[in-house]
């Protein structure tokens, strides 16, 4: 009889490694007076929690830990809120399990 082991997604994500390209983030947020609804949504839907509101009400991105899933591209790139490009070769997420 097999024993089921409950694994949390956070435990699996912890196994991934990230090589940060210091000074060259692959994601930038366009300067804004007040964040669009899509930017505000990113603070909740980004699976890596890269987006957050700062103390002045602006949405900021921390690309360290980005899983390059494309959620921000789908949600915000068309209206210009976010600029996204692939990290340079050798940088970005290194998936341990697939």
UniProtKB/Swiss-Prot annotation:
Residues 57-87 form the 4Fe-4S ferredoxin-type domain. One of its GO terms (molecular function) is iron ion binding. InterPro entries: 4Fe4S_Fe-S-bd, 4Fe4S_Fe_S_CS, ETF-QO/FixX_C, Fd_FixX. It comes from the Bacteria. SUPFAM superfamilies: 4Fe-4S ferredoxins (SSF54862). Pfam families: Fer4_ETF_QO. Keywords: Electron transport, Iron, Iron-sulfur, Metal-binding, Nitrogen fixation, Plasmid, Transport. One of its GO terms (biological process) is nitrogen fixation. Gene3D superfamilies: 3.30.70.20. PROSITE patterns: 4FE4S_FER_1 (PS00198), 4FE4S_FER_2 (PS51379). Could be a 3Fe-4S cluster-containing protein. To ferredoxins from P.putida and C.tartarivorum, ferredoxin I from A.vinelandii, ferredoxin II from D.desulfuricans. This is Ferredoxin-like protein. The gene is fixX.
């Amino acid at each position: 009889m097999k024993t089921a082991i409950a694994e949390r997604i956070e435990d699996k994500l912890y196994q991934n490694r990230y090589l940060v390209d210091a000074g060259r983030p692959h994601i930038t947020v366009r300067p804004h007076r007040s964040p669009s609804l899509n930017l505000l949504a990113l603070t909740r839907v980004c699976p890596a929690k890269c987006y957050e509101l700062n103390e002045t009400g602006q949405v900021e991105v921390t690309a360290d830990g980005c899983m390059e899933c494309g959620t921000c591209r789908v949600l915000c790139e068309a209206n210009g809120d976010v600029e996204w490009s692939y990290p340079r070769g050798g940088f970005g997420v290194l998936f341990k399990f697939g």
